[in-house]
Structure formats: structure tokens, C-alpha cells
Amino acid sequence: MHEINPRPFDETIENGWIIRKFAADSHPLDLVWHADDATRIVVPLNANDWMYQEDNSLPVRLDKELLVVKGIYHRIIKGTTELIVKIKELPAS
């Protein structure tokens, strides 16, 4: 049985952006549905075949900038490549 990793990525901060790297061998069970506490801009930094999915929506390729809205359940779906994204939390409005 796989023990879920609550942080299945490496994270650094650069120029006010959160940089997250998900390994090509990440376990799919670690990529759980969740809702963020803040609205965020997510920008992929590498060519990849990963997907992004919001609740009650079909998955979309994670190949362009996304707006992830606070409180909306979502997940990423593992591809075969490494995934590197930069994330900016937006101020509450």
C-alpha cells in the first residue's frame, strides 16, 4: 500500500514566486483533490504532458498560465515528464 506524501514536490521561492518541481516518477496517489486558501496564478515553466482538472470539469493540458481560484477543488494529473511551475498568490479582494 502506498503512503501518501502530503508534499509531492520540491519547493523554492524566487523573486516572490513559488517554484514547484514535480518529479517524472511522482506517485499519482500523492496528487490529491484539494482547494487552495488563496487565488493563485500558475505558470508552467517546462514542456510537459501533465493535466489540470477542476471539480466537475474535464482535464486540460497544463501548458499555459492558469488562474486557480480560492476554494475551488482541483488536482493535477501526472504525466510522463517532470513538471515545473511557478505560482503567485494573489492578495485577497
Feature locations, PLM:
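Short, conserved beta-strand element in jelly-roll/cupin
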Residues: 35-50
